[in-house]
């Protein structure tokens, strides 16, 4: 029965892909583990695109046993993710531009070496170096002790190895690649949330999509939260770089961020002693409830854009951490169901959502690497069309206090 449930969950993500080849890289149900593995367009006898997909098992230090999967498209992007770390994306490169950042954490840390409750619930930071981290799903946000327990920073899912991992490649052009995983947050008497993740990419393109299906497998309703913590450093982030998004309002996360409210749209150079500033946004969307947020370099010819649905992800957080390059010069663009306040505050302010027993919900995001001025201009035009003539409201008082 359990195996049937797993296969059924993965099947939700397979519909419409009849003419495709697939490979199971990991399966906890069947005891499958491919370890080091590779497939190439040449092996598949594809002549009009050149690409490869490779899984490697890492060794040494705290990355011992961690797995990474890399998609390499000769005329497009190189995308690297880690099944060991909740299917998080490590970095994306292409056209001389990178989406990602330089963390002091250099290894792909195996969660077996992380205690999430260390440093008063900040143990999550010991592995934090990814471009995209799923923060959730049982809870997310800053750590807090409540209800006789520690709600650690940004939840657990980013530190749970995937139980099922598969690769699928369409046999016909444009040869769409799909990397799927199943990540389980299951604790006796507490929670049974399972997330079927999917990354889809068409070789040669400058964008990819995430499609995640969260299912409550328990017999009782359960709360959930999610923040897609998406992080960008150099060469996109620099002095004079800009954050753009159509928003109804912006407010500082805390009193410290008040000092940066007037300059929320621009970034400083690496600055020693700079503490992080966080801003909360209420995003605007088009008639289909779609919106976009982006960080653009000073010259306006490089950037990273995220498109998402505001019904699925109704709030947006922007994290400025323009500290030194060694310490971590990075900004986060974070669509979510919640802001980054502790779950206790998010619950009080009615942003924590609930899934009924057996119910599923899904999240769809598209990431685009902008590598010329025309692409940047198109995103700016799209933001302006949604924003209209009304300027964002700047609210000086934080909506909550930790």
PLM regions and their residue ranges:
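Surface-exposed acidic/polar loop and edge beta-strand patches at domain peripheries
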Residues: 21-209, 221, 232-269, 282-402
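Sec-dependent N-terminal signal peptides
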Residues: 4-13
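N-terminal signal peptide c-region/cleavage motif recognized by signal peptidases
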Residues: 15-17
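An amphipathic, aromatic/His-enriched active-site/gating alpha helix that lines ligand/cofactor pockets
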Residues: 229
């Amino acid at each position: 029965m359990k195996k049937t449930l797993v296969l059924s969950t993965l099947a939700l993500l397979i519909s419409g892909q009849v003419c495709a080849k697939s490979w199971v890289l990991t399966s906890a149900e069947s005891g499958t583990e491919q370890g080091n593995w590779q497939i190439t367009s040449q092996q598949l006898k594809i002549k009009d695109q050149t690409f490869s997909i490779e899984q490697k098992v890492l060794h040494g230090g705290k990355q011992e046993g961690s797995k990474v999967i890399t998609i390499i498209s000769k005329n497009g992007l190189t995308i690297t993710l880690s099944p060991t770390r909740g299917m998080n994306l490590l970095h994306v490169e292409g056209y001389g531009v990178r989406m990602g950042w330089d963390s002091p954490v250099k290894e792909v840390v195996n969660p077996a070496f992380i205690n999430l409750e260390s440093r008063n619930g900040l143990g999550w930071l010991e592995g934090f170096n990814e471009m995209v981290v799923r923060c959730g799903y049982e809870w997310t946000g800053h750590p807090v002790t409540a209800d006789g327990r520690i709600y650690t920073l940004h939840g657990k899912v980013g530190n749970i190895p995937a139980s099922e991992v598969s690769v699928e490649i369409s046999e016909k052009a444009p040869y769409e690649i799909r990397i799927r995983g199943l990540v389980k947050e299951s604790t006796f008497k507490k929670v049974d949330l399972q997330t079927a993740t999917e990354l889809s990419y068409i070789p040669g393109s400058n964008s990819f999509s995430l499609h995640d299906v969260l299912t409550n497998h328990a017999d009782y309703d359960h709360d959930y939260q999610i923040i897609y913590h998406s992080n960008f450093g150099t060469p996109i982030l620099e002095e004079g770089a800009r954050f753009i998004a159509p928003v109804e309002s912006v407010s500082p996360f805390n009193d410290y961020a008040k000092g940066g409210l007037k300059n929320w749209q621009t970034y400083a150079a690496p600055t020693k002693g700079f503490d992080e500033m966080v801003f909360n946004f209420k995003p605007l969307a088009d008639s289909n409830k779609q919106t976009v947020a982006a960080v653009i370099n000073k010259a306006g010819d490089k950037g990273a854009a995220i498109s998402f649905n505001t019904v699925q992800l109704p709030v947006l957080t922007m994290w400025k951490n323009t500290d030194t390059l060694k310490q971590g010069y990075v900004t986060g663009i974070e669509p979510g169901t919640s802001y980054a306040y502790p779950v206790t505050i998010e619950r009080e302010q009615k942003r924590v959502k609930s899934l009924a027993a057996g119910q599923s919900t899904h999240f769809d995001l598209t990431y685009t690497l902008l590598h010329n001025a025309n692409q940047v201009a198109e995103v700016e035009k799209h933001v302006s069309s949604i924003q209209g003539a009304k300027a964002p409201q700047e609210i000086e008082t934080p909506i909550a206090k930790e």
